[in-house]
Amino acid sequence: LIERMQQELDDLRMFMDIGEGTITVSETEDKDWVNNWKNFFHQFYIDDLLVTPSWEEVKPEDQGRKILHIDPGTAFGTGMHETTQLCIRQLKKYITPQTELLDVGTGSGILAIVALMYGAGHAVGTDLDPCATEAVRENMEMN
């Protein structure tokens, strides 16, 4: 497979500059990559909203606050990415009971769920990732 890929790169060079075009193969340590990321995802605030992973307990001092429980599973969407946080801040600012939201590429459902938490009348999420459906269902139940 590597030899074939290298040949394809060499053929491509005849038409354009592809830079160095080297292929590197390495072996990675056998870990539970599906769950290992959880070691780095801890509760955090987006303004007044506490985003907390489903496997962490909410601290006593945070009880009574607006809390989003989230577990993306293998779908995308913890809320840690800056663009997600920007979207959440804008949703919080502009949501009304008349708001109808379409969340394309919903992943974990975080944006649709936040919209509903802040009073949107209706939210629909769609995603090509089949894992997203189960993640959204579980996250909706938690919230």
What are these regions (language model features)?
Residues K66-P72:
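A short, charged helix-loop
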Residues E61-D62, I95:
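Short, flexible hinge/linker loops that cap or flank conserved catalytic cores
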Residues T74, T78-N143:
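Conserved SAM/SAH cofactor-binding pocket of Class I
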Residues E27, P53-W55, P72, T106, ...:
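Short, structured patches in soluble enzyme cores that scaffold and shape functional sites
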Residues D62-Q63, H81:
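Short glycine/proline-enriched turns and hinge-like loops at secondary-structure junctions
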Residues F40-F41, H69, Q85:
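Short intrinsically disordered coil segments
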Residues L1-E61:
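N-terminal auxiliary segments of SAM/dcSAM-dependent transferases
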